[in-house]
Amino acid sequence: MIKLLFMGTPQFSATVLKGLLDNPAYEILGVVTQPDRAVGRKKDIKVTPVKQLALEHGISIYQPEKLSGSQELIEIMGLGADGIITAAFGQFLPTILLDSVSFAINVHASLLPKYRGGAPIHYAIMNGDKEAGVTIMEMIKEMDAGDMVAKASTPILETDNVGTLFEKLAIIGRDLLLDSLPAYLSGELKPIPQDHSQATFSPNISPEHEKLDWTMSNQEVFNHIRGMNPWPVAHTFLEGQRLKIYEAQLAEGEGLPGQVIVKTKKSLVIATGQGALSLIVVQPAGKPKMSIIDFLNGIGRKLEVGDIIGR
């Protein structure tokens, strides 16, 4: 039985971890995940999906704010793991930790060397890519630059958003890891170096990324909305208040960027730099998420054709 240390945080990671837990060839000695966070207006403490799964299986849990130089680092290095598996962990691994095990493998949600970094799925959708994928790669000091063990891809559909693509890629990543790990550990599967000249990056999403730019084409704004749903959610401004936009549809029409060009009891169409978008699901400041019909029956009823949002 191969003894593993698992490191990850979101549901993507938990899906991969569950695959390892269900496989008798592997023993998970401990998991390392991000600290619990206070979320929402009530500041409720939320544990990570990886922690929740580890609790259900009685696995030791480590949650350092920063792994490097921590007491937790000393403890996990003393567990005697053969190797490390990471999947969307969210922190760099100290070289001393990588050197302490026989192998260290990362499940990364992109087709490397494209989209190294922390938000590959967001960028794949926002950039209008036709496919996304997962790469199993060796971990080295440089971020997501290690040799590639295996790759698998899937089409990005017009109906996909970050949430749906995360779910698809988590399953692909789990299966790809379980399929390739035995051959990799036996030496039968030889890793392939990345072409570093082709590397692109997907830095973590900042608040500035969330703001919609209505001067872009309707396809670009549409992709941006999908690439922010369900988190952190794209937004524009209505009378100085933030208006989150969860869903929209491509529409025809012309007008100034951000201008209301169609308003009925059931629809609100906004012009973009090229074409237009029909808003479907929105969330006004201080209100719950709602359909555009409910919005137009409430706060949105004051909007008129010719008004401009986003200012």
From Swiss-Prot:
It is an enzyme of class 2 (transferase). It holds the Pfam family Formyl_trans_C. GO terms for cellular component: cytosol. It catalyses: L-methionyl-tRNA(fMet) + (6R)-10-formyltetrahydrofolate = N-formyl-L-methionyl-tRNA(fMet) + (6S)-5,6,7,8-tetrahydrofolate + H(+). CDD domains: FMT_core_Met-tRNA-FMT_N, Met_tRNA_FMT_C. GO terms for molecular function: methionyl-tRNA formyltransferase activity. Keywords: Protein biosynthesis, Transferase. Signal peptide: none annotated. InterPro entries: Fmt (IPR005794), Formyl_trans_C (IPR005793), Formyl_trans_C_sf (IPR037022), Formyl_transf_N (IPR002376), Formyl_transf_N_sf (IPR036477), Formyl_transferase-like_C_sf (IPR011034), GART_AS (IPR001555), Met-tRNA-FMT_C (IPR044135). Its EC number is 2.1.2.9. Attaches a formyl group to the free amino group of methionyl-tRNA(fMet). The formyl group appears to play a dual role in the initiator identity of N-formylmethionyl-tRNA by promoting its recognition by IF2 and preventing the misappropriation of this tRNA by the elongation apparatus. This is Methionyl-tRNA formyltransferase. It comes from Streptococcus pyogenes serotype M49 (strain NZ131).
